[in-house]
Amino acid sequence: MFFSLKNSVAKLIAFWAICLVLPVWAGHYTFDPILLANNNINANANTDLSLFEQGGQLPGTYQVDIFLGDEKMDSTNVTFHAVKSPTGEYSLQSCLTKEQLSRYGVDVDNYPELLPPEKNIQQDKQASQCVNLAAIPQASEEFEFYAMRLVLNIPQVALRPKDEIPVERWDDGITAFLLNYMANSSTTTYRQTGEQQSSHYVQLYPGFNIGAWRIRNATSWNQSGNSAGKWQSSYIYATRGLYRLKSRVTLGQSYTPGDFFDSVPFSGVMLGDDDNMLPSSQRDFIPVVRGIARSQARVEVRQNGYLLYSTVVSPGPFELTDILPSHSNGDLHVTVLESNGTTQQFTVPYSVPAIRLRKGRLRYNLMAGRYRPANVDVETTPIAQATVAYGLPWNLTAFVGGQWSPHYQATTAGMGVMLGDYGALSSSITQATSEYRQQQPVKGQVWEVRYNKTLQASDTSFSVVNSQYSTADFSNLSDVLQSYRRHDYSRRDWHSNSLRNQTHVVVGQPLGQFGYLNLNWSRQNYRDAPASSSWGVQYSFNIGNLYCSLDWTQNQYRGNQDRLLSLSVSMPLGRERDTYAAYRMTSSDNSKDHEMSLYGHAFDNRLSWNVRQTERYAQFHSGENSGSLGLDWQGSYGDIGGNYYYTPTIRQFSANVSGGAVIHRHGLTLGPQINGTAALVEVPGVSGVSTSEDHRLKTDFRGYSIVPNIFPYEEHDILLETTDLPPDAEVTKTDAKVLPTEGAIVRASFSPQIGARALMTITRNNGETIPFGAMASLVNQPANAAIVDEGGKAYLTGLPETGQLLVQWGRGASQQCRVDYQLANAKKGDAGLYMLSGVCH
């Protein structure tokens, strides 16, 4: 008994000694294998602990997480070589390529010694050549074997600026066909006559990705009442990024940018810089569309005559933030079609910020092609445009531009200045010669001033644009070309309602705990027509659990005035916050509505529902009741919803469906609308797994799902929800970093180990225990490995029903063996863990 106790203590001391020295790489340690022996002193005399004596491990390829300091940069397979130090000690050293270091942010161009001189010349060999990290002064690496972490310690002077992501890390994604779709249909029944009227709308956004190329199309179909359905294609184009130039080339049907001239639809070719490739701190932003609906209404948004967006909104304030961009900064013309047939019309300006560039930065755009009108009767006239802006010293920016067609020529020039604490200001003058159809050429001139500022102390943002038309004869390119129609031979005054001046003002003010205030105002004064203007005030705040918002809008359009005031109050019912009660009052010039509603969500926010009841007091009618019931299901494969709306005179049923699809080399994957850039999550063979981006989006029966709407040229962490994994699946890596280019479908790939979990006791065919520290793995699957403990036990995952394990405890052929197993012959515990034993031959 004394010998047994002494033997156990010795084994315990040896085990903890080994554990304590494993993280230490520099020292040399010697362990006596006899300490691990059982009663038979010579049984483990051949135990090979040389792997641990110097804190080392077997060289080879391991899947590791790569860190640059404390920041995770990558998860990939890295080959490690055994290297000997001048003192004779062995350690593992990674084999990283020059391209990898550049992707991780190292300024490799400043360190040519990373590769031997002959390898710097032979570019085709750089992809596989290991760099010499010692070429960077004070750079080092640490390989934490049991955590599978490779930590790179690089001095800050050897790194690129923090917000400058190397082009080498940008991912063009996979070759794929993608489709976004949106459809809604409504049927209105008039109670007095029984007459029914239906309207249907379908919007399709097909596309194809191959390499850096993106092919995109927008096609819509609209049918209302007894009229025939009509298809309309807004655009079809192919585009790709020129990453080194921070530019983009576009072929086909698109829109010119609206920073110097009004945006123009064209068919042709365009080359210009791409702001999206710049760091996020240098990018511009665009506004959203806000308004107030008096009743359940259809909102249509048009740009340059094209229908961009159509949706049904509930009574009260609405905010549209999911309009697919048309690559244009022109004004958005919004029409609100109320259920009773009345309409609202107003314009949402895109207030382009003051033009200001940092010193040395170049912004340019070149386009040549034909004018692409929305009306097929308008001629497709040849057009061209060129604009250039350059950042000068002293915070100045100079810019020039020109437009040309047979009937129109314009030039613009201006200066911008950054005023430091006082914001940014730019001013320009544009001169144009316009020749309307069947009229003599006329010359016009416009001055424009733009100013924007954010007060850092109060976080107040201002944006002001003012245009003064010096003469009555100034026109833009689209207005002139719209007069050239093929089947209209009448002589008319195309140049009516000429602008005298126009102003757009937007002010945003966060108020901390007191809410948020947003003000917007625009006005257009004409020489021979009534002025048009739009006011808007939105104020929202919280009082405990009570949410309140106040919205006021006044629109004056061609002599018609419309004013709307809305007050909304809502609060949760219960602690779960899945059901809310709300009250809304909407007042216009001729009516006042009081609405009570209940709304909420269920099934992990997948199901949204609402019930509304409204009492209307109009000028000639009082006590008119209306109500609605709506349901919407947001699933992994798209959204589907329905709505019922009634008044004393009509009943209306509507339904909508939307979603997206990606066809890739592994098949078809359905999901929500993509609207730009997306990640394809791959967990092969594991269904029902979500990510941290959206818990409602789960992998399909093959293990694939779509994470939509991620920002291009920015790094994203796609985190797998391991709680969704079934008992027979495990993943060693639960996150994937993606850095997509614009429009890319990038892979967020995970490698699940699907199969059983087992604790296996392994002995050799001569009766000896497998040496402590041996590696046991499935044959031909070295990544799925486990370490054998001092009792010959190994915890294994991802095991098939039958298989063979390879056990290694050294480099020689005599230091490995194989063991067969069958799960059917093993005992399975309550936790799903199999208890196995096997003899290694």
UniProtKB/Swiss-Prot annotation:
Residues 1-26 form the signal peptide. Disulfide bonds join 817-840. Coiled coil: none annotated. Gene3D superfamilies: 2.60.40.2070, 2.60.40.3110, 3.10.20.410, Outer membrane usher protein FimD, plug domain. Keywords: Cell outer membrane, Disulfide bond, Fimbrium biogenesis, Membrane, Signal, Transmembrane, Transmembrane beta strand, Transport. The keyword Magnesium does not apply. SUPFAM superfamilies: FimD N-terminal domain-like. One of its GO terms (molecular function) is fimbrial usher porin activity. PROSITE patterns: FIMBRIAL_USHER. It is found in: Cell outer membrane. GO terms for cellular component: cell outer membrane. One of its GO terms (biological process) is pilus assembly. The keyword Nucleotidyltransferase does not apply. It is a multi-pass membrane protein. PANTHER family: F1 CAPSULE-ANCHORING PROTEIN, OUTER MEMBRANE USHER PROTEIN. Belongs to the fimbrial export usher family. Involved in the export and assembly of the MyfA fimbrial subunit. This is Outer membrane usher protein MyfC. It comes from Yersinia enterocolitica.
